[in-house]
């Protein structure tokens, strides 16, 4: 029982050694996580290994991006093939309904586009193979190398922790008194063992990274060679078809779109007949314009001066009555006397139509009611008096022997309306009779 109650010194020493080993390893992990500066000589000794690790991370990232790019490329190929096929079918359908040279061109181009769309889909086969090989490469080769790298990182952390432990033990070492010599030897043995394990894994990582890069180049060379041959064959066939279509349509007559002559120049290879037709059309339009202008000038000369001066709409129709309806209130007080004077003047003058002539036939054109001012009323009244006096003098010279001269007619004619007598505006009827 006593042998089980007390641990042997060797067992106790091994437990302490394991605890110290864990302590220094944890300290190294903490230093690496916090980014503290490590011993520059130790870091320089692992420069080759760090370069290999950068190559590995580059291979890993590029393979993942290549898989995503191939997937997107396949989707774009399918979309563009569908669009190209639809365009070819549309041109073929329109060519069946068009029997001209344009229909032949559309038919040939439509068939070429449909054929190109089918050949473009052939690129999906080498792309699918490339995607599969890259995915397999990532799942197997890169994953295996990643496992080895993780093991190497743990061995390096343990080795650097052992170096820290040996550095701490060397500070307490005194070879003259043999103080801490035994402890330093045990730490030195631990450092040697961890270094051997780290060097072995370091060599494995460097070899696997080199092999990984070579295998990736070999894989891409085979896969991309198949894709390259398929792509070149596709473009050669497509270019040959398009060249044949261009040669077949080289002799077709070009179209001259006159509606777009301001946006682009007229084609220079027009025939002489087209140029003659354009010249004749321009001359014909010029002659028609001249004839139309001459007809308008002749019609304008045949019209009387008064009819040209007055607008037509103001002399006829219901518009004239509507515009001058406001004069009814001014003419209403003398309407009965105007009718009496008209009856008396008819046998004397012999021309009842003249007395009924509208005073609006003046020299100036009438406008809307909003522009009819009192000054215009005065001008119209003067014109009416002048017209009546000229007519009376002419009739008197011709019929002086048969017709008596009316003595009271001029006064009575003044009551036909205020338009014929400007002095009557603002006076009553009695004042006018006394005057």
UniProtKB/Swiss-Prot annotation:
BP terms from Gene Ontology: regulation of transport; spermatid development
Domain AH: 44-247
Organism name: Rattus norvegicus
Cellular component terms per the entry's GO annotation: acrosomal vesicle; Golgi apparatus
Single GO molecular function: protein domain specific binding
A Pfam family: Arfaptin
Basic and acidic residues bias: start-end ranges: 426-435
Gene: Ica1l
Cleaved signal peptide residues: none
Region (Disordered): 391-435
Coiled coil: none
Protein name: Islet cell autoantigen 1-like protein
